[in-house]
């Protein structure tokens, strides 16, 4: 069925407002869905065809030959995906959040130092070290450690969501009771196992908080331990093939070579990721909007903000604004779709974050947004992984042997049964959702409706 004309859409929205009828009900009764809605500046398919193509991360060239990695603060697995697509091999993940662990397992990760088998608490590095040694991670680790300690205490964007009079408004940085010291806990683990290469990822605020003293001290500790630590650099993910503006701090060190940052690439417009249909993919539920909200959204121009809902329409001809996590306690948030006057689904945000379409997020929809928005874009991780291989491993022929690390990991029987029960439930829920069909399917939560 053809999408609404602008006048048809105005009519149905006005009727909903006058009758007090939910827009979703009116759309279903007319055999329509939110996908049929249009902006006032509706564009035809020729606009999409004119945009450059985007190459998914899982279709890119593999360069490394199975160099082993251990992932810390793994989250939803963005760094893992990028390194694996570049040819590295993840042999263990360390993660404290149960839902993130569920997502990792859902996507094939089986060796996870985290709930329900272990705490995965990096604020207790001695316990993490003991767990990793138990499964066979050796000292002088012949591979890569990578991770991004939680960044909320260093983030400017995170604190803009809080009331200025609240204690969360200021960037507490290294003074944060729970999150501020995790960088140094991670360094403790690095210094114990002495991997050949390490990568630290964080927000750009890491280099400016406390006048840069703490980040400089972190680099000094690693250099004193014999690592060649490249000067930390703030990079824009949009300069490395990610169709999104996202500023991140990258620190790489090696005891077997010198790391060179990858060359930048031409920026991709966000419209490129919408050239391929998304219908039928996992995590693609759209939020329920009122007729009043859609009436406001549909008159927005490219890149403009709806001040009442505090959401922005993406400009399809430019990189996306930063995909955000939406907080840990409130509802998940996303920007407005560039071509449809509604907020984006988790899958659409994941496309912009450069996750493969096959990658699945677990948990409530709001928490899926959290996982997606917190993640390192896999394409950015891929570019850094390729640069590590090119500048270090490809030049170190003498280090090309004995990189096979075998991990021995057998979770307790009771935990194995719990995991199987969870997986069965997820399969049943997924099948039930598929029976309903996708078009017109929405979710509604009081904390997220706009």
Task: State each model region's role.
Residues 1-43, 47, 55-60, 287-450:
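C-terminal target-recognition/interaction regions appended to catalytic cores
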Residues 43-45, 50-194, 204-206, 213:
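Core alpha/beta nucleotide-donor-binding catalytic domains of modification enzymes
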Residues 95, 201, 348:
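Acidic-residue sensor for enzyme active/binding pockets
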Residues 130-144, 152, 156-316:
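Class I S-adenosyl-L-methionine
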Residues 149-150, 195, 243, 356, ...:
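Proline-centered helix-kink/hinge sites
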């Amino acid at each position: 069925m053809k999408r609404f004309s602008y006048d048809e859409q105005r009519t149905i929205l006005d009727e909903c407002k006058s009758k007090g009828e939910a827009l979703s009900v009116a759309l279903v009764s007319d055999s329509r869905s939110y996908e049929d809605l249009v902006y006032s500046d509706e564009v035809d398919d020729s606009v999409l065809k004119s945009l450059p193509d985007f190459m998914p991360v899982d279709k890119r060239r593999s360069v490394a030959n199975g160099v082993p990695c251990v992932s810390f603060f793994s989250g939803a697995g963005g760094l893992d995906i990028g390194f694996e697509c570049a040819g590295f091999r993840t042999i263990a993940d360390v993660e404290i959040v149960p839902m993130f662990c569920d997502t990792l397992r859902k996507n094939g990760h089986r060796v996870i130092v985290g709930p329900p088998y272990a705490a995965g608490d990096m604020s207790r590095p001695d316990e993490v070290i003991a767990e990793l040694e138990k499964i066979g991670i050796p000292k002088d680790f012949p591979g890569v450690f990578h991770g991004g300690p939680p960044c909320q205490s260093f983030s400017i964007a995170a604190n803009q969501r809080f009331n200025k009079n609240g204690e969360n408004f200021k960037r507490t940085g290294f003074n944060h009771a729970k999150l501020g010291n995790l960088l140094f806990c991670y360094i403790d683990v690095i210094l114990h196992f002495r991997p050949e290469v390490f990568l630290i990822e964080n927000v750009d605020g890491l280099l400016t908080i406390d006048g840069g003293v703490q980040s400089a001290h972190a680099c000094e500790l690693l250099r004193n331990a014999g690592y060649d630590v490249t000067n930390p650099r703030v990079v824009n993910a949009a300069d490395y093939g990610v169709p999104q503006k996202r500023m991140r701090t990258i620190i790489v060190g090696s005891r077997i070579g010198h790391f060179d940052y990858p060359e930048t690439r031409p920026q991709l417009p966000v419209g490129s990721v919408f050239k391929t249909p998304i219908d039928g993919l996992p995590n693609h539920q759209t939020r329920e909007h009122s007729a009043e909200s859609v009436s406001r959204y549909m008159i927005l121009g490219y890149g403009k903000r709806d001040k009442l809902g505090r959401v922005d329409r993406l400009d399809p001809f430019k990189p996306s604004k930063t995909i955000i996590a939406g907080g840990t306690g409130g509802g998940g948030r996303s920007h407005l779709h560039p071509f449809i006057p509604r907020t984006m689904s988790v899958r659409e945000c994941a496309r912009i974050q450069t996750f493969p379409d096959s990658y699945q997020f677990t948990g409530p929809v709001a928490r899926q947004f959290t996982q997606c928005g917190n993640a390192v874009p896999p394409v950015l991780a891929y570019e850094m992984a390729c640069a590590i291989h090119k500048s270090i491993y490809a030049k170190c022929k003498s280090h090309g042997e004995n990189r096979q690390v075998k991990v021995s990991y057998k979770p307790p029987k009771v935990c194995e049964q719990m995991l199987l029960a969870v997986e069965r439930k997820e399969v049943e829920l997924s099948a039930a959702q598929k029976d309903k069909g996708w078009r017109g399917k929405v979710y509604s939560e009081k904390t997220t409706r706009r």
